[in-house]
Amino acid sequence: MTMPFGYASPEQQVRDKSEYARKGIARGRSVVVLTYENGILFVAENPSATLHKISEIYDRIAFAAVGKYNEFENLRTAGIRLMDSRGYMYDRRDVTSRALANAYAQTLGAIFSESVKPYEVEIVVAEVGTSIADDQIYRLTYDGSIADERGFVAIGGASEQVTTSLKEHHRDGQPLAEALRVAVQALTVGVPPGLPQNGERVLAAANLEVGMLDRTRTRRMFKRIVGPALEGLLAQTSAT
């Protein structure tokens, strides 16, 4: 049977889409999500003060992403609307990170299968529980694949290097300052594309976006750490 000019098998199309999405994600600077004694910490290498990679979704749920900003921003806002409507129609306790992760997985899977161009995004959805054992972290990739992560996860271009550092230094129940030190240290190990591979990088507060889900807070547990509060925590990390 003669194939038409320009024909590509389904397997080749999947490979091409995957390669395209991975290359786009690899250009993004990494994000780290890890547990600490009172919740879940989000740390992104992000020099922009307005284009956020980290966001609150609902009371106990937050979101982090790397890749093409307009694509993950569309997913973020859709997730907020979905969780708000679920909480309004049913009960706030029915709003879970698992439901949000499943919705994102279906959306990303459909886009990957049906569209010529896949989304160039990698996402983390996290929910803080009443204890460390109840914390939930889900990682979602461009094709809708979903993974249940324990303790920590890194996404973005240098995620393999960053993950190696997290495996060595993260432990359950770390104080906030220590968890931030572990996260920043891991991000400095991962070198974004286009930067020299030699020499130790230093990440200051101006180059970091930091937020947390704090189980000791009431109702809305997400909080950004900015300005003097972040600088003070970074000073503690450099002193340890």
Swiss-Prot record:
Q: How is the enzymatic or functional activity of this protein modulated?
A: The formation of the proteasomal ATPase ARC-20S proteasome complex, likely via the docking of the C-termini of ARC into the intersubunit pockets in the alpha-rings, may trigger opening of the gate for substrate entry. Interconversion between the open-gate and close-gate conformations leads to a dynamic regulation of the 20S proteasome proteolysis activity.
Pathway membership, UniProt = Protein degradation; proteasomal Pup-dependent pathway
Instruction: Note one Pfam family from the annotation.
Output: Proteasome
Q: PROSITE patterns from the xrefs? A: PROTEASOME_ALPHA_2 (PS51475)
Q: Where in the cell is it found?
A: Cytoplasm
Q: What is its main location?
A: cytoplasm
- Asked whether the keyword Membrane is assigned, the reply is no
Record-linked CDD domains: proteasome_protease_HslV
Quote one Gene Ontology molecular function term. threonine-type endopeptidase activity
What keywords would UniProt list here?
Cytoplasm, Proteasome
* InterPro entries per record: Ntn_hydrolases_N, Proteasome_alpha, Proteasome_alpha-type, Proteasome_asu_bac, Proteasome_sua/b
Superkingdom in the source lineage: Bacteria
| Family listed | Belongs to the peptidase T1A family.
Query: Whom does it interact with, and what assembly results?
Result: The 20S proteasome core is composed of 14 alpha and 14 beta subunits that assemble into four stacked heptameric rings, resulting in a barrel-shaped structure. The two inner rings, each composed of seven catalytic beta subunits, are sandwiched by two outer rings, each composed of seven alpha subunits. The catalytic chamber with the active sites is on the inside of the barrel. Has a gated structure, the ends of the cylinder being occluded by the N-termini of the alpha-subunits. Is capped by the proteasome-associated ATPase, ARC.
User: What PANTHER family is this protein classified in?
Assistant: PROTEASOME SUBUNIT ALPHA/BETA (PTHR11599)
Q: Per its record, how is this protein called by name?
A: Proteasome subunit alpha
